[in-house]
Amino acid sequence: MIIIGGSATNGIDESLSKILSIPLVKVENKIFPDGESYIRVPSSIRDEEVLLVQTTDYPQDKHLIELFLIAETIRDLGAKKLTAIVPYLAYSRQDRRFKDGEAISIKTILHILSEVGVNTLVVVEPHKPEELSYFKGELKIVHPYHQIARKIKEIIEDPFILAPDRGALDRARKIAEEINAPYSYIEKERDRTTGEVRIKEAPNINLKGKDVVIIDDIISTGGTIVQATRLAYSLGAKSVTAAAIHLLLVGGAKERLREVGVKTLIGTNTINVNDKDIITIDVSQSIALSL
């Protein structure tokens, strides 16, 4: 067995190599003057079982194309089996047609991964697990809840775990149960044209004097977390921490979250966070346990 580290790994390939005691080969990659990607696998992999690590955070389209190129090259070079470890799977939120005529982007991406020869697909915290049914091979879903719960307990003595919508409640419950913390949820709705988020429903929860941790799968523009943070403080919260498995933080999201009083940000290395102000958890151990 061999690990192939792609063009975007955030160190997960190196960590897996150490955890699993498997040799690591890094792909050679560069960008041509016209913007196209060059990929080369600089090692013999014939008859090998290959673990390919490639996340697809920003720039998503570049990293996806390189994932497809690397995967098919691995099969062309005679690998016996190919497992693609894609810690963050881009386009996962476009899993249906919200408006007539829209592309179902995740469907296309998963079809391509099937066609280029991926036998097993490993994804960390997909937006909706059922969307992965478009992939034709074996699926493995990684939930790094234990690592996140442990980090929360390390920095907050008595946390209250809050899901920013009903869909995130199961995640919040599992993390809360790991550390015997109370939990609840609020309900939001999003305008599909403007993207604006507003609170639709808030159960009768007591947050007075609580250190609240809002946990979601993805924090992108931060609109949902901004609204949830305002609500938490209006209900008497002492502090608010925002945590996500995939901490994208696009378009000034970090600054917006700080402005409304988010004290601490927690993410993982599924995304290239590269910010010393953000607590970043390595999900490699959770991935290794799934293999």
From Swiss-Prot:
Gene Ontology MF terms: ATP binding; kinase activity; magnesium ion binding; ribose phosphate diphosphokinase activity
Pathway this chain belongs to: Metabolic intermediate biosynthesis; 5-phospho-alpha-D-ribose 1-diphosphate biosynthesis; 5-phospho-alpha-D-ribose 1-diphosphate from D-ribose 5-phosphate (route I): step 1/1
Positions that bind Mg(2+) 1: H127
GO CC term (a single one): ribose phosphate diphosphokinase complex
Classification via SMART domains: Pribosyltran_N
The EC number(s) this enzyme carries: 2.7.6.1
UniProt xrefs under Pfam families: Pribosyltran, Pribosyltran_N
Reaction catalysed by this enzyme: D-ribose 5-phosphate + ATP = 5-phospho-alpha-D-ribose 1-diphosphate + AMP + H(+)
NCBIfam families found in the cross-reference section: ribP_PPkin (TIGR01251)
Protein name: Ribose-phosphate pyrophosphokinase
Lineage, highest ranks first: Archaea, Thermoproteota, Thermoprotei, Sulfolobales, Sulfolobaceae
